[in-house]
Amino acid sequence: MKLGKKEGRVLLGGNKPKGDAFEHGFFVEPTIITGAPKTSRLFQEEFFAPILSVAEVKSLDEAITLANASEYGLTAGIFTQEEHEAEAFFDRVEAGVIYSNRRGGATTGAWPGVQSFGGWKNSGSSGKSALGPHYIAQFMREQSQTRVKG
C-alpha cells in the first residue's frame, strides 16, 4: 500500500481489515489504485493481493501494449460488447489465461478443475499449464534407452 500511496492515489480500500480474524498475517482490503505512472511496479509486477491498478488508455492497442510490457503474463481480462475487440485482445495479449466479460468466480479468470491454469513469460511454468496435457512432464526426468542385442 505504501507504493500505491507513493506513486498513485488509493481510490478505495488499502487498509488492514478490522477484526480478530485479521489480527495475524498480511491481510489487506480490496484496493483500487489510480494515477500511478504506467512504468510503475504497480503495472509491472504480480501482486498476489486484492489490488487493482487502473490506468487510462486511449485505445485497445495501447491497453494491449501496456499489458504486454510486463515481464509477467499470468492472466488478463477485457470487458467489451464488441466481438472484434475481444478477438484482438485474445490474439495479442501475452498471458496464459485470458477471459472476456467474466464477472464471477475466481479472480484468475480460469475455472479451476475445468480449464488449465498457467502463465506465460515469468509467470508459471514455461507455458505449461496446470491440468494441461504436458504439465506433469516438467516434474519428470526424461530418459531415452536403446538396447541392441547382438
Kindly give the residue locations of the regions a language model identified.
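Short secondary-structure junctions
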Residues: K6-K16
